[in-house]
C-alpha cells in the first residue's frame, strides 16, 4: 500500500493484526483475496484520489477477487466476468459510448484516480458477506472518512453503500441500485454514473476521470 495511508491505518494497527492473524490461523477456512491484495486499493496515493466507488465485499469466487472493488484479474476471459461487472460494463457503454472492454480488470480507472474500495476487505470462498462484522467496516470507514473534507464525489451502488457515504458525511453522492442482476433493472441501468461523476468534477474545476478501458 502507498505510504500516504499509513497515518489513517495507524490507529487500527492492532485491530488489523488481530484480523489477519485470525484469518491465517483458521486453517479450515480459506479467505479471499490473497493476503498481499487485501489493501491493494490503497496502492493509489491518497492525494491522487479523485472519486470513490464503494463496494460491498470481495467476489467470493476463487480467482476473481483481487483487492479492487468490482475488478477481476485481466486473465479472466471477458465472457466469464461476474454478472455485476457485466452490468457495469453495459452501463459504461451506454453512458459513455465506449466499446466493450477486453478484460474485467479496472486498473485503468485506478490510474485515473478512482479508489475502488470494498467496505469489507475479505470473504470466505462461496460465502458472500461471510466476514461482515469482523471489523473491516470500522477500518474502511476511517479510510473513507479521511477523504470527506476534500468533497470528492462518490459512486454508491446499493443502499448499504449509499447509507455509508451519507453517514460519513460525503455530499457529492451518485447513488443508484446495485448492478447485480437482482437490482440492475430497478434503476442502475440508465443511471449514468460515470458521466455524472465527471460533471461534478468539472463543476468543482477538477480534472475529469478518464473512464476509457481497453
Regions picked out by a protein language model, each given a short descriptive name:
Residues 186-190:
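Rhodanese-like catalytic fold shared by cysteine-dependent sulfurtransferases
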Residues 2-156, 160-168, 172-175, 179-184, ...:
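A polyanion-binding, active-site-adjacent surface
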Amino acid at each position: 500500500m502507498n505510504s500516504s495511508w499509513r497515518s489513517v491505518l495507524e490507529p487500527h494497527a492492532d485491530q488489523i493484526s488481530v484480523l489477519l492473524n485470525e484469518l491465517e490461523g483458521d486453517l479450515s477456512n480459506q479467505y479471499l483475496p490473497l493476503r498481499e491484495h487485501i489493501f491493494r486499493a490503497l496502492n493509489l496515493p491518497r492525494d491522487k484520489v479523485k472519486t470513490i466507488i464503494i463496494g460491498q465485499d470481495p467476489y467470493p469466487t476463487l480467482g476473481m477477487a483481487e483487492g479492487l472493488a468490482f475488478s477481476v484479474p485481466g486473465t479472466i476471459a471477458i465472457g466469464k466476468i461476474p454478472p455485476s461487472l457485466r452490468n457495469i460494463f453495459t452501463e459504461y457503454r451506454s453512458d459513455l459510448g465506449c466499446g466493450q472492454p477486453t478484460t474485467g480488470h479496472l486498473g485503468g480507472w485506478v490510474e485515473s484516480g478512482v479508489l475502488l474500495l470494498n467496505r469489507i476487505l475479505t470473504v470466505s470462498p462461496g460465502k458472500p458477506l461471510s466476514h461482515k462484522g469482523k471489523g473491516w467496516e470500522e477500518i474502511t470507514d476511517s479510510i473513507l472518512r479521511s477523504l470527506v473534507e476534500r468533497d470528492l464525489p462518490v459512486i454508491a451502488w446499493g443502499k448499504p453503500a449509499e447509507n455509508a457515504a451519507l453517514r460519513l458525511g460525503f455530499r457529492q453522492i451518485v447513488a443508484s441500485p446495485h448492478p447485480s442482476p437482482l437490482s440492475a433493472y430497478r434503476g442502475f441501468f440508465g443511471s449514468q454514473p460515470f458521466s455524472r461523476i465527471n460533471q461534478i468534477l468539472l463543476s468543482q474545476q477538477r480534472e475529469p476521470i478518464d473512464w476509457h478501458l481497453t
